[in-house]
Amino acid sequence: MTHLRSLAVVSVLAFAPIADFPTLITTAAYANPTTPEKLWDGFNAPTGIAVHSDGTVYVSNWGDSTVERIAADGTRSAVLRGVPSPAGIAIDAEGTVFVSSYSGDYIVRINPDGSHTRIAENLATPTGIAFSAEGRLLVANRAAGEILSIDPSNGLARVVARSLSLPVGVTEMADGSLVTSQYGGRVTRILPDGSMQELGESFSRPGVGILSDGPDAVFVIDNGAALVRRVSFNGRSEVVVEGFEGSAVALGRATNGDLLVGTWGTGAVYRTPISR
């Protein structure tokens, strides 16, 4: 098992603000902000959502320490139990599911035969996770204020972002930049050269859920306002989904492009199409 606290840092980026990027000054409702449809309830604090290419939906069910699978026909089952505070969830190119344990400080892989293997340990409240184009696992290592990039085959890690404000979500963009949502109030784009662009001025409190939307924008949960925003790199922030019951936390994308949102308080997963 890999003990990340004892690992030497392979690569650390230095950060500098991007002076030439626009500040976030434009805030608006989307052209057609949508009202979500409740698909499923009975969860206990759904925190992460990932969708397999075959349409199977996986939900990290924080309050029950389980990972739930919802088949295309709606059948639900627990594929993993006893995970302390399961948070982020991601599926690799082979269809293998990975989950972060926020309270256990580890990342676990769910193997095709139903067994599970810890691939990295001794993290610092790992929250949102996502795969990079290179197949590395990106981890929002919340308590350490950093983003890690982990080789899922051996658990070796490197720090790719530091000095963040309680990062809870991360996604990679087509240009190789990373965007991270932070519970401390920031949404930050980190370019490959280490420079940063702040995008979160319109947020009440960014949440775990974050997804890319094309090459130059992201969908992000605004946990403090119970809605989903779309933030583009040109400085525009728009409300795209509102009207949730409970506190929006998780964000996933269905195979048809609809957004899936998990809410705390009501223990539900919602679906909403995005109107352009």
Question: Would you name each region that the model predicts?
Answer:
Residues 8-23:
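Bacterial N-terminal signal peptides
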Residues 21-34:
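Blade/loop signatures of beta-propeller domains
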Residues 35-40, 75-80, 115-120, 156-162, ...:
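A short beta-strand motif characteristic of beta-propeller blades
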Residues 41-54, 82-94, 105-106, 122-136, ...:
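Beta-rich, blade/repeat-based domains predominating
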Residues 59, 99-100, 139-140, 180, ...:
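Conserved beta-strand element within WD40/beta-propeller blades
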Residues 62, 102, 142, 182-183, ...:
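Short loop/turn segments immediately following the C-termini of beta-strands
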Residues 66-69, 105-109, 146-149, 186-188, ...:
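A short loop-to-beta-strand structural motif that recurs across blades of beta-propeller domains
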Residues 70-75, 110-115, 150-155, 190-195, ...:
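Short loop/turn segments that connect beta-strands within beta-propeller blades
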